[in-house]
């Protein structure tokens, strides 16, 4: 029963991590495409809040429940699919802190534009591009992790099955 409870929490955390993360990402993209500093400042404030209070804790819950599930099943951390997913998770996590910082910076830049009555400058576009591409790579990693969790195979093992 403990295993099933942990697995349930692990899956819920994955849903929150992926769902809120993707939702935040898409909302800030949509807001930025308006080029309206007021819209961007408001959406970025909410995105920073949701990512800080929901998405980030979901990531910690993922790693804790994943570790407990591995311990409970007696599976070594060096099992190929486990180690691969853990490495990808850590890489995605390493992108996460800079993404949070960049989101906060985008919010501050948009708010400053609102307060001064100016339009967003090239500085905003540069920070936005970094944030955007870090998000692309982060979500690609998350898609791969979900595939690994479902199949219990590494990507190269799956490719080997297709060849």
Roles of regions detected by a PLM:
Residues 1-163:
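Polytopic transmembrane helical bundles with strong interfacial aromatic enrichment
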């Amino acid at each position: 029963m403990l295993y099933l409870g942990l697995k349930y929490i692990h899956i819920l955390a994955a849903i929150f991590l992926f769902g809120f993360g993707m939702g935040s990402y898409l909302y800030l993209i949509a807001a930025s495409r308006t080029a309206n500093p007021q819209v961007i400042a408001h959406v970025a404030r909410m995105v920073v809040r949701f990512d800080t209070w929901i998405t980030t804790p979901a990531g910690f819950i993922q790693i804790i429940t994943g570790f407990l599930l591995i311990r409970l099943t007696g599976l070594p951390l060096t099992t190929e699919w486990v180690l691969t997913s853990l490495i990808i998770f850590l890489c995605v996590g390493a992108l996460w802190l800079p993404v949070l910082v960049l989101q906060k910076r985008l919010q501050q830049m948009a708010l400053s534009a609102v307060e001064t009555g100016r339009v967003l400058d090239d500085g905003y576009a540069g920070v936005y591009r970094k944030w955007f591409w870090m998000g692309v790579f982060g979500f690609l990693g998350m898609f791969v992790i979900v595939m690994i969790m479902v199949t219990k195979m590494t990507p190269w093992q799956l490719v080997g099955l297709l060849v």
